Amino acid sequence: MSSRIDRDVINALIAGHFADPFSVLGMHQTQAGLEVRALLPDATDVWVIEPKTGRKVGKLECLDARGFFCGVLPRRKNFFRYQLAVVWHGQQNLIDDPYRFGPLIQEMDAWLLSEGTHLRPYETLGAHADTMDGVTGTRFSVWAPNARRVSVVGQFNYWDGRRHPMRLRKESGIWELFIPGAHNGQLYKFELLDANGNLRIKADPYAFEAQMRPETASMICGLPEKVTQSEERQKANQFDAPISIYEVHLGSWRRHTDNNFWLSYRELADQLVPYAKWMGFTHLELLPVNEHPFDGSWGYQPTGLYAPTRRFGTRDDFRYFINAAHAAGLNVILDWVPGHFPSDDFSLAEFDGTHLYEHSDPREGYHQDWNTLIYNYGRREVSNYLVGNALYWMERFGIDALRVDAVASMIYRDYSRKEGEWIPNEFGGRENLEAIEFLRNTNRIIGEQVPGAVSMAEESTDFSGVTRPPETGGLGFWFKWNLGWMHDTLDYMKLDPVYRQYHHDKLTFGMLYNHTENFVLPLSHDEVVHGKKSILDRMPGDAWQKFANLRAYYGWMWAFPGKKLLFMGNEFAQGREWNHDASLDWHLLEGGDNWHHGVQRLVRDLNHTYRHHKALHELDFDAYGFEWLVVDDNERSVLIFVRRDKAGNEIIVASNFTPVPRYDYRFGVNQPGRWREILNTDSMHYHGSNTGNGGVVHSDEIESHGRQHSLRLTLPPLATIWLMREGE
């Protein structure tokens, strides 16, 4: 036995309490010659093998029955490649010793990770197939600076934490190990002896694939190839582009009718993608697909930020789905949740026995609304983990945009908290300065590294500058959900038409602040759950009036400045609330033509017409693109405005939000001439009453509303019409 190996060290190593396994295991120079040491539980015999010749150059002595072997090669002084021939249960196995390989992480990578400025930390941390010194295997690395010991456990070592303890890189707090023979498809986790001496089994924060819930292991999976964003996809995200988003929960869009099981990613590629294209949508927005343990969270409590959920297939199946969407001309938006994470033991919570990813004080680190933990954005490594994740989805999967969830909960320390339940920032204010800087930095990096990709904020307050560039004090998002518009307009639409005249401002107020941000008009999943009813069911009146109200509302929404977002099921007026455990009510579209078909046809026509006419989308965020023609006729609940493109072409939009047709309704126009009715939500095609203007109307040289020329229209009941100028 080497005099250098103390019995206490062997005991600590075997017990899993030794933090520096490379100082003991592997090949070491001693005065007696090269000494090879190995910890091989359950082995009976071990030889050192020279790979070139296959010759046994020495036998290791078992110094501890629990599996510690040691042997001196007296004629050898210089390190050489070797293997170990190990006899387990009477059978000899030839293995490469993990402890003969040097440090894995380059000094520059280690420094960047410590500084929190590594743009792509996922290329270094996690599990990566590799070849070292001619040996194939997988290199593992994990950030756990306060752990006393970390081991890789998995299918390749019987989930035994004694077999593969890792090397600590003290300068960065990262543990690393190359395990020969570990390969793609095998499951693994990290076993940590934490800062308090407790044993923890953790999934890899950087795992590229994970087990199907309720199992929680990570899976070795190669890093996807980089994806470049085409010029067409970049243009589709621009401010002047038509953007109509179909928001989808993959687990409940459609299910197998025989067993209510989910469609796979590939089945969704074959069914959802062509449907969204046929409907005329430009973008698909996916509720979070990051791995998550609880179906009822809809993905908004993720435990595997880098792993697409296995519910619908493999990582490569998900890439197939994204590619299919792109091939169909659809950009893909991913709901992204950097605001909080669940407290499940296998995930990030108290990762190394300390509050590593979250704040230690619950007034900063605990989200009482969702029973989740809040990221510590002030810790550089944590922010780096999240920023890297944003780039990962965009660069490795071709995600075109990220919609950031619950931004308000991130940027305000007192969000949903009473007095005494939150801690002010260093200046005594309520803003979370670290979260604000994190968002600015993330958006800045997206703009620099992935030209054409964009981000969208679900931000529910009046925080100033959400879509202003970081250098001018903004958060740097490209778009912001206009939740104020959504609440105001739905509050208006649910009113009996008799009372709408007293709430006219609900529809007009949005234009007072419309140009303060780059807005998306969202009718999202949040509006059809938790007792809010479906959008259809909020409409007043009998069945005919409900559908007419909904059609009029959609016609108003698609013409109003801002990009469009519609949650699945709303496009055919599903009558019940969304249920994540069941398919949409596709049976409503079965049988003969009905009101649901009418709404579906309307949404399809809205999308295609909206995309065709630049006036409806080119100047969403420019005051020149919108002008009221009639804004004060609250008694008749009539509103008329014009949309305009850069060339000055106009489309007139007129809405009548009462069930009373308005005949001979005169209003002034900017451009005299012949106007064609290009869309009428009351058309019989959509199961309306078919009241309208016979296709074409001509202006009169009669002054109205301060304009020299005017139109005299029939405004259908509970309807919106669009008119395009055809000529003089």
Swiss-Prot record:
The active site is at 405 (nucleophile), 458 (proton donor). Its EC number is 2.4.1.18. It comes from the Bacteria. Pathway: Glycan biosynthesis; glycogen biosynthesis. Keywords: Carbohydrate metabolism, Glycogen biosynthesis, Glycogen metabolism, Glycosyltransferase, Transferase. InterPro entries: A-amylase/branching_C, Branching_enzy, GlgB, GlgB_N, GlgB_N_E_set_prok, Glyco_hydro_13_cat_dom, Glyco_hydro_13_N, Glyco_hydro_b. GO terms for biological process: glycogen biosynthetic process. Pfam families: Alpha-amylase, Alpha-amylase_C, CBM_48, GlgB_N. It is an enzyme of class 2 (transferase). One of its GO terms (cellular component) is cytosol. Coiled coil: none annotated. GO terms for molecular function: 1,4-alpha-glucan branching enzyme activity; cation binding; hydrolase activity, hydrolyzing O-glycosyl compounds. It catalyses: Transfers a segment of a (1->4)-alpha-D-glucan chain to a primary hydroxy group in a similar glucan chain. PANTHER family: 1,4-ALPHA-GLUCAN-BRANCHING ENZYME (PTHR43651:SF3). Monomer. Catalyzes the formation of the alpha-1,6-glucosidic linkages in glycogen by scission of a 1,4-alpha-linked oligosaccharide from growing alpha-1,4-glucan chains and the subsequent attachment of the oligosaccharide to the alpha-1,6 position. Belongs to the glycosyl hydrolase 13 family. GlgB subfamily. HAMAP family: GlgB (MF_00685). This is 1,4-alpha-glucan branching enzyme GlgB.
